[in-house]
C-alpha cells in the first residue's frame, strides 16, 4: 500500500503508516507559496496511490486548503481508487469551522474525516477522537482492526461533558481570532517571516539559535526542523492569551536585539 502526504505536515501520519507497512510518498509544498496545498498536490495522486492525507488546517503551517480544492482532491482520489483522509482536529478553533468542514462531502465512500475532542477542549491526556465516514464496509474493517475497549468510560464521559461547553468553545474561538493577527503582526514587526495561518498556532522563520536563547527565559517554542520540508529556522508558536503573547514578543525583542 502507498500513501501520499504533503510535506511539511503532521509527522504522526507517516509514523503510523510505516508501522502498518505502508510506503509513504511525500509531495513537497513550495516555500515560495507559503507551503500552501495547490493543484499540484492533486496531480500527484495517481493509480498507485491508495490513501491521501490532508491536515486541515495544516500542522505546522496553519494553512487552510479551500473547500473547493478539497473537493477536487476527493474527486481525483475517487478516480484513482484512493481514500482521502482529512484531519480536521484543529479546524474547531475557527468560528466558521462547520462551513469549512468537508462534512458536506461525506456522501463519497472515499472520504474519511478525523476529529478530536482533545485539541479545542484542552484534554489531550484523555486521548479521545473519532472519524466520520459513510463507507460502512470500511468502518467495519477499522473496528475489526482496532483494539477492544479503545475508549475508556472516563474518556466517553469527558467527551459528552465537553459537548455541553458551547460557551467555552465560543470564547476560545473568539480569543484565537482576536489574538492571531496581533501576534502575527508583532512577530513581523520584529523582522520575522510569519505565515498567514488560520489555526491556533503560527509558523515563523527565525535564527536557528532562537530556541536555545529562549529556553533559559522560561519560553519553549516548537522547533520544526524535524518536519520533512522544513529546516531548523522554522518555529511554531501557539496563539495564547494577550498577556502571554505580549510576554513572548517582549522576550523575542530582547533576544533578537
Regions found by a protein language model. Name each.
Residues 11-16, 110-194:
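PLP-dependent aminotransferase class I/II
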Residues 18, 35-48, 60-84, 88-120:
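Active-site pre-lysine segment of PLP-dependent enzymes
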Residues 25-28, 51-58, 84-88, 195-196:
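Short beta-strands and strand-loop turn motifs
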Residues 68, 216-217, 226-257:
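PLP-dependent enzyme catalytic core of the Aspartate aminotransferase-like
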Residues 146-147, 159, 203-217, 233-241:
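Accessory recognition modules or surfaces
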Residues 176-177, 185-218:
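Conserved PLP-binding catalytic core of the aspartate aminotransferase-like
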Amino acid at each position: 500500500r502507498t500513501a501520499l502526504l504533503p510535506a511539511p505536515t503532521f509527522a504522526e501520519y507517516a509514523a503510523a503508516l510505516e508501522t502498518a507497512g505502508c510506503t509513504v510518498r511525500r509531495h513537497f509544498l513550495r516555500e515560495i507559496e507559503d507551503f500552501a496545498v495547490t493543484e499540484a498536490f492533486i496531480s500527484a495522486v495517481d493509480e498507485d496511490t491508495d490513501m491521501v492525507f490532508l491536515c486541515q488546517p495544516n500542522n505546522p503551517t496553519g494553512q487552510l486548503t479551500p473547500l473547493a480544492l478539497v473537493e477536487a482532491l476527493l474527486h481525483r482520489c475517487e478516480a484513482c481508487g484512493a481514500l482521502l483522509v482529512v484531519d480536521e482536529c484543529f479546524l474547531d478553533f475557527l468560528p466558521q469551522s462547520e462551513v469549512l468542514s468537508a462534512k458536506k462531502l461525506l456522501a463519497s465512500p472515499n472520504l474519511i474525516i478525523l476529529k478530536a475532542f482533545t485539541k479545542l477542549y484542552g484534554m489531550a491526556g484523555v486521548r479521545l477522537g473519532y472519524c466520520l465516514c459513510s463507507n460502512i464496509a470500511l468502518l467495519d474493517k477499522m473496528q475489526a482492526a482496532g483494539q477492544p475497549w479503545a475508549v475508556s468510560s472516563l474518556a466517553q464521559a469527558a467527551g459528552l461533558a465537553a459537548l455541553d461547553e458551547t460557551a467555552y468553545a465560543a470564547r476560545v474561538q473568539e480569543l484565537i481570532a482576536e489574538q492571531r493577527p496581533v501576534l502575527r503582526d508583532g512577530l513581523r514587526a520584529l523582522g520575522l517571516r510569519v505565515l498567514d495561518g488560520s489555526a491556533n498556532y503560527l509558523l515563523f522563520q527565525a535564527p536557528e539559535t532562537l530556541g536555545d536563547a529562549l529556553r533559559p527565559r522560561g519560553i519553549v517554542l516548537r522547533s520544526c526542523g524535524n518536519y520533512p520540508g522544513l529546516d531548523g529556522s522554522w518555529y511554531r508558536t501557539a496563539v495564547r492569551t494577550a498577556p502571554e503573547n505580549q510576554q513572548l514578543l517582549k522576550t523575542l525583542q530582547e533576544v533578537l536585539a
